[in-house]
Design a protein with these regions (language model features):
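Bacterial N-terminal signal peptides that target proteins for export
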Residues: 2-15
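Bacterial N-terminal signal peptides
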Residues: 13-26
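Extracytoplasmic/secreted cell-surface and envelope-processing proteins
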Residues: 42-44, 69, 91-93
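N-terminal post-signal-peptidase region of extra-cytosolic proteins
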Residues: 63-70
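Structural micro-motif
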Residues: 73-84
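Non-catalytic, surface beta->alpha helical segment in thiol-disulfide oxidoreductase systems
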Residues: 83-120
Length: 120
């Protein structure tokens, strides 16, 4: 009997599985986070936004220099953190009257987790 080399078959199977997992992760339930602030309010920025897990942090938009973004996203107070799922806004966290972010990293992360779990 001839021995069949199954190494390549296993490799191809794992590669197809990896491609499928990556595709599903990118195609469904994509969470993005944007922090809006202004240069003059840097002291009240939420630096922990970049440490949020299971989401893509788009970054920081300075509404003092990007008035179009302020208008488009209806930013009334800064800092503001907006969470998007599949391109739609699903949550917003805003500062208090002293321009300080009230929400904690844990609260924002919990919202991200809730949004991810809502797909199941």
């Amino acid at each position: 009997m001839e021995k069949v080399d199954t190494t390549w078959r296993i490799f191809i199977t794992y590669m197809l599985l990896l491609v499928f997992v990556l595709f599903c992760g990118n195609a469904f339930g994509q969470i993005k986070v944007i922090q809006f602030n202004a240069g003059w309010n840097k002291a009240n920025e939420a630096p922990w936004v970049v440490k949020l897990e299971d989401c893509q942090t788009i970054g920081y938009i300075d509404i003092a220099t990007d008035k179009e973004a302020q208008k488009e996203y209806k930013i009334a107070v800064i800092p503001t953190i907006v969470i998007f799922k599949d391109g739609d806004e699903v949550a917003r966290f805003q500062a208090d009257l002293s321009f300080k972010m009230v929400a904690t990293r844990e609260e924002v992360q919990e919202e991200i987790n809730d949004q991810l779990m809502s797909d199941f």
